[in-house]
From Swiss-Prot:
Source organism of the structure: Homo sapiens (Human)
Tree of life domain: Eukaryota
Residue spans crossing the bilayer: 42-62
Membrane topology of the entry: Single-pass membrane protein
Keywords for this protein: Membrane, Phosphoprotein, Transmembrane, Transmembrane helix
Pfam families from the UniProt entry: WBP-1
Bias kind Low complexity: ranges: 158-173
InterPro entries to which the protein is assigned, alphabetical: WBP1-like (IPR021684), WW_domain-binding (IPR051994)
Compartment list: Membrane
Name listed for the protein in its UniProt record: WW domain binding protein 1-like
Length: 342
């Protein structure tokens, strides 16, 4: 074949073995004593093709890697563009989503910076008592005999006179300011003016005739407990006749104590509470037993201890004195043993 012939068609002198020369009429020198007429018979022919094939493979691999990298970048760019359009182009929403307002979910920064909402009240029973029962129980004015007027005014101030002005959504864990911060004469002047209106407004929802005498006894007993057992302005959180027990959901279940009362009075009070609150009233079974650190201090004293106290005759208590004040968790049991009745 003419295209496989050598480039040189003239005679060529070749050097063979032992420096012997020979002449090739056609083709070119090949080997020791041969004349080659085709290129595939040369050794460098295959070397050149091998190098060409290796370089071609390298170029193909590099091209494929570059192509894959470019496609990945293009896909990521398309994904980012789609996400950006979905987040900022509200017209691309489906038809049934276009009429929804944009303020259904607040921004993340607003949720993080907003203060936490207050927890719910301890129980629905306590919230209903704040709305239905009178804010305080007791006569319109005056204090029982044998009580210091200064302490009596502080006790009157410690009673929930400011409860009508409180918001119903205020969490019960927030304690009221200390009554020692306010002047004594101001509390003494405010007590006679505010007590009748609060008592009449609260008793108008239930039965005024049934609670009138019981409220007077409850108020008198409360002032005696404040002056004898507590003897300090911080005793506003002490409410006799109320026990607390922890329920497991970080709340305190408040129940009413039944101690030494007649059956007819208890039935009458229970009937009134059931009619007002549409549910049975939970009375404590452990009122006569005082577990350490689980009930308010000085609330469940035995009748013998109360009889031995000088100047404090035993008075029949109503079935319950429902003054819903916040429980002070920081009171220690040693604070009551150090105070003595005046």
């Amino acid at each position: 074949m003419p295209f496989l012939l050598g480039l040189r068609q003239d005679k060529e002198a070749c050097v063979g073995t032992n420096n012997q020369s020979y002449i090739c009429d056609t083709g070119h020198c090949c080997g020791q004593s041969q004349c080659c007429n085709y290129y595939y018979e040369l050794w460098w022919f295959w070397l050149v093709w091998t190098i060409i094939i290796i370089l071609s493979c390298c170029c193909v691999c590099h091209h494929r890697r570059a192509k894959h990298r470019l496609q990945a970048q293009q896909r990521q760019h398309e994904i980012n563009l789609i996400a950006y359009r979905e987040a900022h182009n509200y017209s691309a929403l489906p038809f049934y989503f276009r009429f929804l307002p944009n303020y259904l979910l607040p921004p993340y920064e607003e949720v993080v910076n907003r203060p936490p909402t207050p927890p719910p009240p301890y129980s629905a029973f306590q919230l209903q008592q704040q709305q239905l029962l009178p804010p305080q129980c007791g006569p319109a004015g005056g204090s029982p005999p044998g009580i210091d007027p200064t302490r009596g005014s502080q006790g009157a101030q410690s009673s929930p006179l400011s409860e009508p002005s409180r918001s119903s959504t205020r969490p019960p864990s927030i304690a009221d300011p200390d009554p020692s911060d306010l002047p004594v004469d101001r509390a003494a002047t405010k007590a006679p003016g505010m007590e009748p209106s609060g008592s009449v407004a609260g008793l108008g929802e239930l039965d005024p005739g049934a609670f009138l005498d019981k409220d007077a006894e409850c108020r008198e007993e409360l002032l005696k407990d404040d002056s004898s057992e507590h003897g300090a302005p911080d005793s506003k959180e002490k409410t006799p006749g109320r026990h607390r027990r922890f329920t497991g959901d970080s709340g305190i279940e408040v129940c009413v104590c039944n101690r030494g009362h007649h059956d007819d009075d208890l039935k009458e009070f229970n009937t009134l509470i059931d009619d007002a609150l549409d549910g049975p009233l939970d009375f404590c079974d452990s009122c006569h037993v005082r577990p350490p650190g689980d009930e308010e201090e000085g609330l469940c004293q035995s009748s013998e201890e109360q009889a031995r106290e000088p100047g404090h005759p035993h008075l029949p208590r109503p079935p319950a004195c429902l003054l819903l004040n916040t429980i002070n968790e920081q009171d220690s049991p040693n604070s009551q043993s150090s105070s003595s009745p005046s």
